[in-house]
Amino acid sequence: MVLGGLMKLFDEFKAFVMRGNVVDLAVGVIIGAAFGKIVTSLVNDIFMPIIGMIIGNIDFSSLVIKLGEPVEGAEQAAIRYGMFIQEIVNFLIIALCVFVAIKLINKLQKKKEEASAPAPGPTKEEVLLTEIRDALNKIAEK
C-alpha cells in the first residue's frame, strides 16, 4: 500500500518536472547564474578599473565611509558605497542585456507570426468594387 502510494507520488512528480515550463525555468536559472558571473567579472575586472582610471585612479571597491573607531579583533564598521556603485553598474548592464535579448526575441516572434499568418481576405470595399465591375461587365455584354 505504501509502495503504491510512493510510486504514484513519484509518477506525479516526474510528470510535473517533465512539463516544459519547469524544465525551461530550470535551464533559465542555470544560464542566468552563469551569465551573472560573467557580468560581475565584466564590471569588476574591466569597466570599473577603466572608470576608476578616468576619474583619477580610484578603486571603487575601497571607497568606504568609516563608522566610529575600530574595535580590536573586529572588522572596522563601514558603509562600503564603492561596492554599492559596482552593484548598480552590474544591475544596469544585466538590465540592458535582458532588454536587448527581449527586444530581439519579440522581433523574431513577430517575424515568425507574420510569416505564418494567412493572407487577409478582400476588404468590404474590394468586394463591393468587384461586384460593381462584374455588374458593369454584364451590362456591357448585353
Curated annotation (Swiss-Prot):
Annotated TM spans: 15-35, 38-58, 82-102
Pfam family, any one: MscL
Disulfide bond positions: none
Membrane topology recorded in Swiss-Prot or TrEMBL: Multi-pass membrane protein
Annotated keywords: Cell inner membrane, Cell membrane, Ion channel, Ion transport, Membrane, Transmembrane, Transmembrane helix, Transport
Domain of life: Bacteria
Cited InterPro entries: Mechanosensitive_channel_CS, MS_channel, MSC/AndL, MscL_channel
GO molecular function: mechanosensitive monoatomic ion channel activity
Main location: membrane
Keyword Manganese: no
Subcellular location: Cell inner membrane
GO terms classed as biological process: monoatomic ion transport
Record's GO cellular component terms: membrane; plasma membrane
Assembly information from the UniProt record: Homopentamer.
Functional note: Channel that opens in response to stretch forces in the membrane lipid bilayer. May participate in the regulation of osmotic pressure changes within the cell.
Alphabetical list of HAMAP family matching this protein: MscL
Protein family (similarity comment): Belongs to the MscL family.
This protein's name: Large-conductance mechanosensitive channel
Gene source species: Fusobacterium nucleatum subsp. nucleatum (strain ATCC 25586 / DSM 15643 / BCRC 10681 / CIP 101130 / JCM 8532 / KCTC 2640 / LMG 13131 / VPI 4355)
Gene name of this polypeptide: mscL
